């Protein structure tokens, strides 16, 4: 397999959409998304991020299970040079607050509830202003850097915007503005902050660069002899390195298909496989 020319995640997705545009990139249940469709959604999300003032170097947190929206958000964040802060879906309320504050997240893309845990209610408990303010202008002393909260599952109230409403903002920024932002991204720039489990102390943020994720991922795929004909079942969490910094770039750099399982369930896994 030929090593991709791209050295940043945004460029990598563009490269794959050109060379393998109609090929299926993502499978989630009955939904199939091609590389071209993935890129289109990423570009819309990236322009929407620019519309709310997210810029190169800003931290944007993602709190979600293994879903296409996680991957759309992550690559959109990377495409404009911002840093995707992956939050564990096993986080306690204290750990969630710690990760958002410690990373200085300017925006949060989230599922309101995951496996029965109401994360949005936990944020409201710390930040009652969330229910009283306007979207994209959130201001709370508990999370002083956070200005934008977007829910994937559509819950809206006060400063909370839905995924669809946020995506509709993409028309406020041109394709040229996105290209300018993308051109500013350096291969050595940080693309991910992935947090450790926090078993011995508070979770620690580990910074990973675009080039390192791509190069390491390609080499992993080479050792596994992956090709564009392969499908990779991905049930390990994307918020940890095995998911987003190992399995994901390994299959993506080889043009294969990612089959997402939202969270591990043995019976469901056998059906998917």
Question: Residue locations for each model-derived region?
Answer:
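Conserved AMP-binding/adenylation subdomain of ANL enzymes
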Residues: 214-234, 239-272
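Conserved S/T- and glycine-rich ATP-binding loop of Class I adenylate-forming
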Residues: 60, 77, 190, 196-199, ...
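Structural core segment of the AMP-binding/adenylate-forming
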Residues: 52, 80-165
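Short hydrophobic alpha-helices that are characteristic scaffold elements of the AMP-binding
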Residues: 75-80, 101-102, 240, 252-253
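Conserved AMP-binding/adenylate-forming core of the ANL superfamily
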Residues: 3-10, 14, 22-75, 92-97, ...
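Structural motif
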Residues: 63, 87-90, 111, 235, ...
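Conserved pre-ATP/AMP-binding loop-to-beta segment of ANL
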Residues: 6, 22, 142-146, 150-157, ...
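Conserved G/P- and acidic residue-centered "switch" motifs that form tight phosphate/ATP-binding loops
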Residues: 81, 199, 255
